[in-house]
């Protein structure tokens, strides 16, 4: 008996696996929300302290750095909203859930980093022609160190958790915090340069840091845009294929497709089995493949497994179907031609 699972025979998540996958997704989203809350608080305090210092030092560079810190804190809000949305159940309209909101938040973060780099370069170029005078150099330097430590702490925290839960957007937000930490360093070096009698040190360091920010934008955007276009790391499909191919009853893995949806991965796998198997036996093999995939791939939250008989794998089966001989095809075409010549016996809707 030929076995091919489609709607009724697709391997679905068993109750145990379903609860496990959902629990893992909720936990990951909860961790993401916690990170955004903590980083928002840390960067908010950092920015407020710097703003107070700006008030009595008049440091333009420190003011720019303070604005960057407020901006970085603000980018935590759409990411927070995205993690919250990802916990909602799928609907008829959004039947894959709301994970893509996280990728869109990542895009906003990349654009924010780019804006920071452009602003830093603009300010540095302006200061080349008119180096600013800075009062209370030691206070400005301490504020810059405080800003750097606050931003770098948040950056390390965001990137660590982002890698653990598979969130490109959270990693990008970590890079955003690091960028603001670099602008704090620019303020520090500028203050030291003025103290040493080299006022041009401030804008020169600012330009160097602007170039570093541009590089961060390029590297971060690769990951974010890749996920928006359903890209995945090249080794992931190979891992899926390897796990599926060593499962008992699988003779071949015909096709593998994997994509990210927020911080979770979805997979579609076509496996080839003995055509003499019953529908139930083919379904059991598919369930086992599903089980192995969920337990062996860290970020995978669901996998759809299709079963094809040997000789007609994947799209080949859909083109020809089981027992779809040339005679049957001619019969179908002849029947279709005859039906065109028959009068329409349908009900009339005319009044």
Task: Please identify what each model-predicted range represents.
Residues 2-39, 55-57, 61-67, 71-351:
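Alpha-helical transmembrane segments and adjacent TM-loop junctions that form the membrane-embedded core
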